[in-house]
């Protein structure tokens, strides 16, 4: 067996990011051939990925990317097994590259992203194979849990990631794409992340759901001995409370709890003569 130099081991480590001992073994197994050693490590990563496929990957990061025109964005969740790995440069850099590649290529799902090449930074590997390689490098199960692509025609897209990258959101608004509108959109994205709305406006709440909730409230009120003549008023009050908690436009604004989100949009329209409408939002929380 040929003698493996420390220089060759370092070169392989620089190329793959894998530990020194694993690089030494790969070169030993490959007779000192650098390309074969890289392939050996990739195969080892694939084998480890298969071995770890059933393991739980509940840590990771949420990444949001918005293009320079502020009309297109990507939000994704990439998982690993431990917070230690999730905070490392290798993992976060990998997640960032996937997000940027998805944004550049207008990829709209995690499934489609698996077949997309990550370019020279990852030796041209498709995401599916790069995940296996990264699994071998980091020693943990890696998975692209979900990914969404958002585009606005004539409006804007903005995002927010909470410090720690465990929570993020992306919103799409119509009505304008000024610098002031972008600032507002970012605040709305922060609102979505912090206040966990489930719909934009009350008209988006399914009628059958409202009827179901009304019946639950009715039965609760009657069970508590409330007079029949007051039950309808109680139901109305509880529904209003529900809307204030779950409907984005009716929530208290995170920057001013005395103002509703809808009021903020209305005031913006008056100030800048630019009607702004929130069309949609997506919120990712790690593991949720």
From Swiss-Prot:
Pfam families, sorted: EF_TS
SUPFAM superfamilies per record: Elongation factor Ts (EF-Ts), dimerisation domain, UBA-like
Source organism superkingdom: Bacteria
Region feature (Involved in Mg(2+) ion dislocation from EF-Tu): 82-85
Gene Ontology CC annotation, any one: cytoplasm
InterPro entries for this protein: EF-Ts_dimer_sf (IPR036402), Transl_elong_EFTs/EF1B (IPR001816), Transl_elong_EFTs/EF1B_dimer (IPR014039), Transl_elong_Ts_CS (IPR018101), UBA-like_sf (IPR009060)
Keyword Protein biosynthesis (UniProt): yes
Subcellular location: Cytoplasm
Entry's family note: Belongs to the EF-Ts family.
PANTHER family (alphabetical): ELONGATION FACTOR TS (PTHR11741), ELONGATION FACTOR TS, MITOCHONDRIAL (PTHR11741:SF0)
UniProt function note: Associates with the EF-Tu.GDP complex and induces the exchange of GDP to GTP. It remains bound to the aminoacyl-tRNA.EF-Tu.GTP complex up to the GTP hydrolysis stage on the ribosome.
NCBIfam families attached to this UniProt entry: tsf
Protein name as annotated: Elongation factor Ts
UniProt lineage: Bacteria, Pseudomonadati, Chlorobiota, Chlorobiia, Chlorobiales
């Amino acid at each position: 067996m040929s003698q493996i130099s420390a220089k060759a081991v370092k070169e392989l480590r620089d190329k793959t990011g894998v530990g020194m001992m694993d690089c030494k073994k790969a070169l030993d197994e490959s007779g000192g051939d650098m390309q074969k050693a890289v392939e050996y490590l990739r195969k080892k990563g694939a084998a480890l990925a298969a071995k770890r496929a059933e393991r739980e990957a509940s840590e990771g990061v949420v990444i949001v990317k918005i293009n320079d025109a502020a009309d297109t964005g990507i939000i994704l969740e990439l998982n690993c097994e431990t917070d230690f790995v999730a905070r490392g440069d290798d993992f976060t850099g990998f997640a960032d590259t996937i997000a940027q590649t998805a944004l550049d290529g207008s990829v709209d799902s995690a499934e489609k992203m698996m077949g997309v090449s990550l370019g020279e930074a990852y030796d041209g590997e498709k995401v599916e194979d790069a995940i296996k390689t990264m699994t071998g490098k980091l020693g943990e199960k890696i998975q692209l849990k979900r990914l969404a692509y958002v585009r606005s025609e004539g409006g804007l897209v903005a995002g927010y990631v909470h410090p720690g990258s465990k929570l993020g959101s992306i919103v799409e608004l119509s009505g304008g794409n000024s610098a002031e509108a972008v600032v507002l959109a970012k605040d709305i994205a922060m609102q979505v992340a912090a206040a966990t709305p489930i719909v934009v406006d009350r008209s988006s709440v399914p009628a059958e759901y409202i009827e179901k909730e009304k019946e639950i409230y009715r039965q609760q009120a009657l069970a508590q001995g409330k007079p029949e003549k007051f039950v309808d008023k109680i139901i109305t009050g509880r529904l209003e409370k529900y809307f204030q908690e779950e409907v984005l436009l009716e929530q208290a604004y995170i920057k001013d709890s005395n103002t509703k989100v809808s009021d903020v949009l209305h005031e913006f329209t008056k100030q800048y003569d630019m009607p702004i409408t929130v069309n949609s939002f997506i919120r990712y929380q790690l593991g949720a």
